[in-house]
Amino acid sequence: MMPRKIVYGENAAKEFEYPEKSLIITTTTPDIYEKWLSYMGIKNYEIYDKVTPDPAIETIEEIKKKYDGKEISTYIGLGGGSSMDVSKYLSKLTGIPKILIPTTFGTGAEMTTYAVVSFSHKKKLLQDEAFLADVAIVDPYFLPGTPFNIMRNSACDAMAQASEGYDSKLGNPFTRFFCKEAFDILEDAIINDKPELLPYGAMLSGIGFGNSSTTLGHALSYVFSNEGVPHGYALSSCTTVAHQFNKSPYYERFKKVCQKLKFEPLKLKLALDEAADVIMPDKGHLDNNPIEIKKQDVIYCLDKIVNANPLS
């Protein structure tokens, strides 16, 4: 599955004709989004700019309540995965269509039927066909000026998605084609310092894993994200260890990219046994892993992540 309409390329966000009375949902500050909106030429809109990373269900309910009774034609998720995930969930609740526009190029959220929402301070991966964008717009305009930490976390996320998606039990020739293309492009972007390739690679990654799944690396990462570690940062070690465990063809290549991006080792406050108990119910990731995963395997992987510096 893919969005009903995909608009890609230089000036894509500038040339698109946006409906009036849209609600723009973003995580960024006025000094940044006002520049974006001027470029995009959007008129007669509302804006909600208080979305935080790993958005809570309470935030979504607050937005819905705030704009109940107002005439909203479209949700525009403008930013990283969190802004787009909030727009997806709101669209499912209200039936209002959504336009998704990434500015960080990592999650591939604009291409998928997935959304990550926090319930009781714990991230949960949700899937629903209603989360698919009505329009996805990918424009490299938003790339310049992206802080290094955001860029590297986003790139790692996209590469983890592509490589885990390639290995997934749900994969097929169609999804593996997109996952392979995405990884090759993203690897070239990082290793050979070609950041202009990141938007295209992330978009292809979203198509690939969005029609298969991510696997063990993502399942391991959420206990770190629950302790405040950015998602892409958590994946640097988690997906490296998962690829090694799975004997993935992407193990060495993924590790090399993470070394180039200079990710630091991860720490975990939660005891490994308790962390494994949190991870094991994540059947959406673990059941699609190429190798069957048991609790002792999760503990083994977590131990390597926090005690063996897998990126050294």
Task: Show which residues each predicted segment covers.
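Carboxylate- and glycine-rich phosphate/diphosphate-binding segment that chelates Mg2+/Mn2+
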Residues: 70, 114-212
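C-terminal charged capping/lid subdomain of soluble metabolic enzymes
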Residues: 252-312
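Active-site pocket-lining segment
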Residues: 215, 219-273
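Alpha-helix C-terminal capping segments
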Residues: 88-97, 209-212, 226-228, 244
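ATP/NTP phosphate-donor binding region
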Residues: 1-74, 265
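Glycine/threonine-rich beta-strand-loop-alpha-helix active-site module
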Residues: 57-141
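Short alpha-helical scaffolding segments that buttress acidic/His motifs in well-ordered protein cores
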Residues: 159-163, 198-206, 220, 239, ...
